[in-house]
Regions:
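Short glycine-aspartate micro-motif
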Residues: 11-15, 73-77, 124-128
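Glycine/GP-enriched mid-protein hinge/lid loop-to-helix segment characteristic of carbohydrate kinases
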Residues: 47, 123, 134-163
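Residues on a specific face of well-ordered alpha-helices
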Residues: 53, 57, 94, 113, ...
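Conserved phosphate-binding catalytic cores of ATP/NTP-utilizing and phosphoryl-transfer enzymes
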Residues: 1-7, 102-126
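Active-site phosphate-binding/coordination module
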Residues: 94-99, 128, 138, 143
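Short beta-strand-loop/turn "lid" adjacent to the catalytic site in phosphate-handling enzymes
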Residues: 59, 63-99, 118-119
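Short glycine-rich, Thr/Ser-proximal phosphate-binding strand/loop in the N-terminal lobe
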Residues: 7-53, 57, 143-145, 150-151
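Short beta-strand scaffold segments in enzyme catalytic cores
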Residues: 21-26, 116, 127, 133-138
Length: 163
């Protein structure tokens, strides 16, 4: 992609789980122009600071790989494992805004992002079994219900399912 195609309206997506943190920069038409991956961090166990450090590194890598400046990011969406309780989303959003110096940020549990990435309709449910396990249900009115952090870690995730 050459520099003339850039219109200053990019979306930054961040996906953080226990194994990895991935970030992608895309144009408004969905074409991905830059990606980066760093270590994972589950903030309820490893701390918010560590999670933010990994998200910032992945985001900055994706922006650099896209060949744009942070000021060209119009909107950021972060799907973060561990956003399970009321207020977690706002806490992560505010911390990301401060760390990355970006404006519009939406943060939610990564299962919500997983649901919308494959949904054929606006409501339904998804279960995600990665390093950990969580799920989300979105009802016909758009209300989100997240299930996560209710089980012992050794009893959840893909490795527990394989036992």
């Amino acid at each position: 992609m050459d520099k003339q195609e850039k219109n200053g309206k990019y979306i930054l997506g961040i996906d953080q789980g226990g194994t990895k943190t991935a970030a992608a920069v895309m144009r408004e038409d969905g074409f991905i122009v830059g990606c980066a991956t760093t270590k994972g961090a589950y903030f309820p166990n490893e701390g918010v600071e560590n999670a933010l450090e990994q998200m910032a590194a992945a985001a900055e890598g994706a922006v650099n790989n896209a060949g744009i400046g942070k000021e060209e990011i119009a909107y950021t969406v972060a799907g973060v494992g561990g956003i399970d309780w009321t207020g977690d989303d706002m806490m992560i959003r505010d911390a990301l805004r401060e760390r990355l110096s970006l404006g519009e940020i939406f943060a939610c549990n990564d299962a919500v992002i997983a649901f919308y990435s494959g949904a054929l309709r606006s409501h339904g449910a998804v279960i995600c079994a990665g390093t950990g396990m969580n799920g989300a249900l979105i009802d016909k009115n758009g209300r989100q219900f997240v299930y996560g952090d209710y089980m012992e870690e050794k009893a959840q995730g893909g490795s527990a399912l394989a036992k």
